[in-house]
């Protein structure tokens, strides 16, 4: 074995389930890998990390674990035994890899992995992306050496060793936000993002919104509708005579290009989305997913809304009329558009990736 590889520091990263956990963790992994660290991932085989992590060149190990919230009685009764089994599986991975530090960034594997790390005497560092912590991180915060969070006041005051560091995001988005952007004087460019599965409420109302606004203003729309929704949403735009001004896509592979194109974004308010909007300096109309655990997306949205960088439209009151009204404000006042973008950039934490990586490195050195 190459002596440089064998002596380089090692980190086990636990993150999975959603892009909001996986992509920030990948940003940290890439940063540390460039510094010579050995990276190994702990996840579950049936979630997105199983595909994304190897695509980015990192080794991943799997354990068997599911969520425990909101399940039936029999599953809850079986849960303790399954958790114990998954802790044993995670400890086997740790014993094999011998990491210097463990970073937990959310997802099902983080709980058993964090407990196994504690039992193995390995320093555990947590990062919480949302404004309200998930159940796993709430529990692990009691045993972690350091608890990192994206937003202030995320954890209770009795949780020790908490530090606000922001959400790690891709470097190209940080660089995009550093460029001075002047909203176009012609058509208002509206980016609609509903996540990998799309947001049904946005898919339903946007065609009517565009049909109404196009009577008074020039606008173009890039609408990401989610898997298997493209034909239906495209037909809705066509029926209202709006197909020429709208680009309907199942997915947007290049979000940097989408953010660069857009004047304003209509979207959910997942933690990563909120952090990216701040970093690229774009105003937004935020429609929190109403069924998110502890309604954390509404709290996430408040980071931008309270700064004057976005508007909040709860799904319970959202309709074509009030969404069109908000977009009309942007269409009629490009100066307001620019000011809100500047305010968004003002709440961005641009060195989050380095801060998370440096803190992990500091605990690895302490051993």
From Swiss-Prot:
Binding residue positions for UDP-N-acetyl-alpha-D-glucosamine: 18-20, 130, 170, 196, 252, 271-276, 297
Record keywords, A-Z: Cell cycle, Cell division, Cell inner membrane, Cell membrane, Cell shape, Cell wall biogenesis/degradation, Glycosyltransferase, Membrane, Peptidoglycan synthesis, Transferase
SUPFAM superfamilies to which the protein is assigned, alphabetical: UDP-Glycosyltransferase/glycogen phosphorylase
Annotated coiled-coil segments of the chain: none
BP GO terms, sorted: carbohydrate metabolic process; cell division; cell wall organization; lipid glycosylation; peptidoglycan biosynthetic process; regulation of cell shape
One MF annotation (Gene Ontology) recorded for this entry: UDP-N-acetyl-D-glucosamine:N-acetylmuramoyl-L-alanyl-D-glutamyl-meso-2,6-diaminopimelyl-D-alanyl-D-alanine-diphosphoundecaprenol 4-beta-N-acetylglucosaminlytransferase activity
GO CC terms: plasma membrane
Entry membrane topology: Peripheral membrane protein
Subcellular location: Cell inner membrane
Pfam families: Glyco_tran_28_C (PF04101), Glyco_transf_28 (PF03033)
Assigned EC number: 2.4.1.227
Role this protein plays: Cell wall formation. Catalyzes the transfer of a GlcNAc subunit on undecaprenyl-pyrophosphoryl-MurNAc-pentapeptide (lipid intermediate I) to form undecaprenyl-pyrophosphoryl-MurNAc-(pentapeptide)GlcNAc (lipid intermediate II).
Family the UniProt entry places it in: Belongs to the glycosyltransferase 28 family. MurG subfamily.
UniProt cross-references to PANTHER family, sorted A to Z: GLYCOSYLTRANSFERASE, UDP-N-ACETYLGLUCOSAMINE--N-ACETYLMURAMYL-(PENTAPEPTIDE) PYROPHOSPHORYL-UNDECAPRENOL N-ACETYLGLUCOSAMINE TRANSFERASE 1
Protein name, per record: UDP-N-acetylglucosamine--N-acetylmuramyl-(pentapeptide) pyrophosphoryl-undecaprenol N-acetylglucosamine transferase
